[in-house]
């Protein structure tokens, strides 16, 4: 099993130590049975020391068994911690394009459901290991008592285990399907939570989402979980009843066939009773391990970036003068839409506005410009030199951005991840009219319950605090009131230029196009620059041009 192989590779010596403890626990368990057989059944030892010896063995068995199980459980939790941390780091290192293809619902399912299933498996793993080791050790002890009886008992037990595995295989099959259904349910949950306002307004749509999206997926989940539980419980009960049958078989072989005396039969029965709980626990634990393997395979199918422990420090381009996109093209995976070839040269300190209709490719161009999407052909050049695709972090370090689907972080960070310049923060808090709204504590924003427009202002503050050369603003002013929108174009953008910022703003505010150094337009994935009469016409009626 690939999951256990990975544990072995990463924690070889701790794993060996845990196995040694498990072997010691099994040996003590068998030794206790031998002690009962030799000192309490066969010879009926009347010495007063027999009880303290027996109690001492019990306490030692308890301590070693508990120690081995705790050690294995702790090892499992260390592995899960490492697995989750590596998964998060791989998400952070994976191209945005790939993350968008996967979708947040499936990734959240991986971080919650899949990792939880792996955790449960490692909690139950001690039961599986203990059951296997005790079974092997007990078989060796029973062989010494009666080889013929062990052979028949082993055949009986083999049938028991085979039947259990057949049933468990069906559990595995349904668990694999169940995991796919969970992804659908997470998408349904996201629809209900993210679309709560629209669904509250439109009860017919809410009914459709509930009856046509959620209910079929929930019913499919219910079907497979019931089937999985049915086969799991069948496996446990099959094993339970067959173990009791083995005890009857032992006494039949001893008394009817005369293969052993009553003391040996009693020892056999005692050993089987001792094995009953660990063996049944092992059978019960096996589905969790199989489910964990399904979850582990699901995590691997995400095809995220390889794990790298370090966060490479990007190298800055402090004195760049021109940024050029030369014959850059990009097409989405389904080939439903493409942009390019794009040819664009940006000079340091320029203020550029990009206009275009919905679906014209504005946001895609923004993703290409910032290095979040990789061009499928063409190249990006800084001062005439191609930007290496092997180190996109160096290029991305030029940019701060405020996207339309803004996410607010509560920590203000400056260059190189250090605390933000307090004078800069104070200045822009005042400029953004947020000084009375935001509560800061040690560079952390305490209150983030803000309106959408206010969140955009905080996002701009976060971007400016990073003190990077180029700032991308994707329809930033769309959520501002008319007064502050005018303030943004007439006051804030010139202030940013005075700071040396190069500004690339996606905008539909035709009244303010006059403030741009250059006006660009995206139309059906093609970029053009508007000059002269075209620019004047766009300024008079941007809506008509971008419809």
Swiss-Prot record:
Q: Which GO terms describe its cellular component?
A: ATP-binding cassette (ABC) transporter complex; membrane
Gene null: resulting phenotype: Disruption increases sensitivity of cells to microcin J25.
Q: Which SUPFAM superfamilies match?
A: ABC transporter transmembrane region, P-loop containing nucleoside triphosphate hydrolases
Q: Where are the transmembrane segments?
A: 16-36, 47-67, 125-145, 149-169, 240-260, 270-290
> Which one GO biological process term can you cite for this protein?
microcin transport
Q: GO molecular function terms here?
A: ABC-type transporter activity; ATP binding; ATP hydrolysis activity; ATPase-coupled transmembrane transporter activity; peptide transmembrane transporter activity
User: Which Pfam families does UniProt cross-reference here?
Assistant: ABC_tran
UniProt entry keywords in alphabetical sequence: Antibiotic resistance, ATP-binding, Cell inner membrane, Cell membrane, Membrane, Nucleotide-binding, Transmembrane, Transmembrane helix, Transport
Name used for this protein in its record: ABC transporter ATP-binding/permease protein YojI
Q: What is the lineage of its organism?
A: Bacteria, Pseudomonadati, Pseudomonadota, Gammaproteobacteria, Enterobacterales
Domain ABC transmembrane type-1 spans what residues? 15-291
Question: Where in the cell does this protein reside?
Answer: Cell inner membrane
Write out the similarity annotation: Belongs to the ABC transporter superfamily.
The protein's job, in short, is: Mediates resistance to the antibacterial peptide microcin J25, when expressed from a multicopy vector. Functions as an efflux pump for microcin J25, with the help of the outer membrane channel TolC.
Which residue numbers delimit the ABC transporter domain? 323-547
Q: Which InterPro entries match?
A: AAA+_ATPase, ABC1_TM_dom, ABC1_TM_sf, ABC_transporter-like_ATP-bd, ABC_transporter-like_CS, Cyc_pep_transpt_SyrD/YojI, P-loop_NTPase, Type_1_exporter
């Amino acid at each position: 099993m690939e999951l256990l192989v990975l544990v072995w590779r990463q924690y070889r010596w701790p794993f060996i130590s845990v196995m040694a403890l498990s072997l010691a626990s099994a040996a003590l368990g068998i030794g206790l049975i031998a002690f009962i057989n030799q000192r309490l059944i066969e010879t009926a030892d009347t010495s007063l020391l027999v009880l303290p010896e027996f109690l001492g063995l019990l306490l030692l068995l308890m301590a070693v068994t508990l120690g081995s199980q705790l050690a294995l459980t702790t090892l499992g939790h260390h592995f899960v911690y490492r697995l989750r941390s590596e998964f998060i780091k791989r998400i952070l290192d994976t191209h945005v394009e790939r993350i968008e293809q996967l979708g947040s619902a499936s990734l959240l399912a991986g971080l919650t459901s899949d990792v939880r299933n792996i955790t449960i498996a490692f909690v139950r793993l001690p039961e599986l290991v203990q059951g296997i080791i005790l079974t092997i050790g007990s078989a060796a002890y029973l062989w010494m008592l009666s080889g013929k009886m062990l052979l028949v008992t082993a055949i009986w037990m083999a049938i028991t285990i085979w039947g259990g595995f057949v049933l468990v295989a069906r559990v595995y099959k349904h668990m694999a399907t169940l995991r796919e259904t969970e992804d659908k349910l997470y998408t349904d949950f996201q629809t209900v939570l993210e679309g709560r306002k629209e669904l509250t307004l439109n009860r017919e749509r809410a009914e459709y989402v509930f009856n046509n999206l959620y209910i079929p997926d929930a019913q499919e989940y219910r079907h497979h979980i019931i089937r999985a539980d049915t086969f799991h419980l069948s496996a446990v009960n099959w094993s339970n009843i067959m173990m009791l049958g083995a005890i009857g078989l032992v006494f039949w072989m001893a008394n009817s066939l005369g293969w052993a005396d009553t003391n040996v039969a009693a020892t056999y029965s005692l050993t089987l009773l001792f094995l009953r709980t660990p063996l049944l626990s092992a059978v019960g634990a096996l589905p969790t391990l199989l489910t964990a393997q399904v979850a582990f395979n699901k995590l691997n199918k995400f095809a995220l970036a390889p794990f790298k422990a370090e966060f490479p420090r990007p190298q800055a381009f402090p004195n760049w003068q021109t940024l050029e996109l030369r014959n850059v093209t990009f097409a989405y995976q389904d080939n439903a839409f493409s942009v390019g070839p794009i040819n664009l040269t940006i000079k340091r300190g320029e203020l550029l506005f990009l206009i275009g209709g919905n679906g014209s490719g504005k946001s895609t161009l923004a993703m290409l410009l910032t290095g979040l999407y990789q061009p499928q052909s063409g190249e990006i050049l800084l001062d005439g030199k191609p930007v290496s695709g092997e180190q996109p972090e160096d290029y991305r370090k030029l940019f701060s951005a405020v996207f339309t689907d803004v996410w607010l972080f509560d920590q203000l960070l400056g260059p190189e991840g250090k605390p933000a310049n307090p004078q800069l923060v104070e200045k822009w808090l005042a400029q953004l009219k947020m000084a009375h709204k935001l509560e800061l504590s040690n560079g952390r924003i305490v209150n983030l319950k803000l309106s959408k427009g206010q969140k955009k202002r905080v996002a701009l503050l976060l971007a400016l605090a990073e003190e990077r050369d180029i700032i991308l603003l994707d329809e930033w002013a769309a959520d501002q009131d008319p007064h502050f929108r005018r303030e943004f174009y007439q006051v804030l953008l010139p202030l940013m230029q005075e700071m040396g910022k190069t500004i690339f703003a996606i905008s539909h505010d035709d009244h303010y196009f006059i403030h741009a150094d250059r006006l660009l337009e995206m139309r059906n994935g093609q970029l053009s620059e508007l000059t002269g009469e075209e620019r004047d016409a766009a300024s008079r009626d941007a809506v008509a041009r971008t419809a």
